[in-house]
């Protein structure tokens, strides 16, 4: 246990997580006391992971306030784990909870970045599905990078047996 505590106290970098999915279950239960799931030790591939996310996490998201709360829980979980540098992917699809406003999503992420700036070096990336239209990636990706809130682009999706 002493080694675990020592490792926990060391400063860390998390160079890739999916922001609204990265919160500790304990913090999640503080805000959503009816949550009745445990995170499995492993998933049955990408499809199994997506099934878990849709069934358990996405079910909590009904509004932009819920998305902001999940992102806030994610960043606080990182801070609690002594993460000093966080690169987190913010899925473009979350705009649907912000009345399809990319600007509103950018503003929400920017406010979290500012809120925690003295506690963590937070560098969000905008996440696009690999199946996104190239025009959308260029158009929205440029808006996000030029906002100076986002520092990169995360292109994600099933990678087995597919060209990148």
Residue ranges: model-predicted function:
Residues 1-164:
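Metal-cofactor-binding active-site regions of metalloenzymes
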């Amino acid at each position: 246990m002493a080694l675990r505590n020592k490792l926990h106290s060391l400063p860390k970098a998390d160079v890739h997580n999916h922001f609204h999915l990265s919160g500790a279950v304990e913090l999640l239960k503080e805000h959503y006391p009816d949550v009745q799931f445990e995170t499995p030790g492993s998933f049955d591939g990408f499809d199994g992971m997506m099934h878990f996310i849709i069934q358990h996490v996405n079910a909590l998201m009904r509004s932009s306030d819920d998305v902001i709360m999940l992102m806030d829980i994610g960043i606080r979980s990182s801070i609690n784990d002594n993460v000093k540098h966080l690169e987190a992917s913010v899925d473009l699809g979350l705009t649907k909870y912000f009345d399809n406003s990319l600007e509103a999503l950018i503003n929400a992420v920017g406010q979290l970045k500012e809120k925690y700036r003295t506690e963590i070096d937070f560098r969000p990336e905008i996440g696009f599905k690999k199946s996104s239209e190239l025009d959308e990636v260029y158009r929205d990706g440029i808006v996000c990078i030029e906002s100076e809130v986002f520092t990169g682009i995360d292109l994600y999706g099933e990678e087995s047996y597919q060209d990148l």
